[in-house]
Amino acid sequence: MNYTINENETLKKMTSPLANYIFNKKDGTMLTWGEDKDKEASRFPAPTILDIEVTTICKGGCPFCYKSNTSNGKNMSLENFKHILDIFPRTLTQIAFGADADLTANPDLWKMMEYAREKSIVPNITAAWFDEETADKLARYCGAVALSRYEHSKDKCYDSVKMLTDRGMSQVNMHFMLAEETYQQCLDTLGEIATDERLKKLNAFVILSLKAKGRGVGFHKCSQEHFNEIVNKAQDLHIRLGFDSCSSAKALEAFYFDENIEKCIISCEAARESSYINVDGKYFPCSFCEGTKGWEEGLDVLSCSNEEDFIEKIWNDPATLKFMEKLNNTTDKHGCRHCPIYKV
């Protein structure tokens, strides 16, 4: 393997010829660079970030769920989860758990998080709401937690934010799925963040751009004009903003006046740095490409027996490399990579 890992209780460092990082396991800060510190990493020798789906069961009923999840579904077993982490390259720094609205569907969720911690991997997760007992467990295991803001569960979302910040968590964010149909709700939410006492310790408001998949089909992407209006209002209210990498092109346009903004925004890293594994243990470059052309079936991670197997059969599989090449060919005038599947 053409990389080395060094770590202690606080920091994890990976060095390789074309991609390097320093990751702070305490606060989630991650610095990445390529051949030298002025260049972007071209591709990591193995994933540093893993999005893993541990259940398809969800009673949240969100109108634009791209997974189209319902109360009927299945869970990933603890055995399969452990196998995935056991064979995964040591480059991995953190996991984003894909679970259900209130984090009750998979009874092994907390054992999974505990196992990740044993391997010095930081668990992160997104929910819509939860109870006090769940908040205790999240504060114990997670580095960051995001609360999805839906109109039908707004107060439960805000209450859940306060539960975590009351427990001393600093990396508590709010996620908002932005489409033309939700644009006004987004503006209203910014106003509420500025005035609602439950949200006074919120870390950041994070915009997730629509990918028209699942129940999201029928929604329409937000215009650049409306996107800019949201950014401007957040700045006027002194609210910290974040974006998913899918929103990078719009964010660069919205912050055109800031000459340093390109240093702060990272475009799509699928098949370059990040990875996704579904509930069946199948790999896809990202969760949104599952079931799309060329990715009707994923790559079987459970068949891998060790780290070398994963790198050869999954990370360097021709299908993965083809996706990366297609993504790299979408680069625009800002050097920003655009989604090769959806119009975002």
Regions found by a protein language model. Name each.
Residues 46-53, 249-257, 318-329:
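Short, intrinsically disordered, charge-biased short linear motifs at domain edges
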Residues 1-10, 14-20, 26-29, 282-283, ...:
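Flexible mid-to-C-terminal extensions adjoining Fe-S/redox cofactors in radical SAM and related proteins
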Residues 64, 68-71, 274, 292-295, ...:
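Secreted/processed peptides and extracellular or luminal domains of membrane proteins
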Residues 1-2, 119, 141-284, 288-309:
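Radical SAM enzyme [4Fe-4S]-AdoMet core and its adjacent flexible, acidic
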Residues 58, 62-65, 268, 286, ...:
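Short cysteine clusters
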Residues 52, 56-59, 262, 329-333:
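Processing junctions and N-termini across compartments
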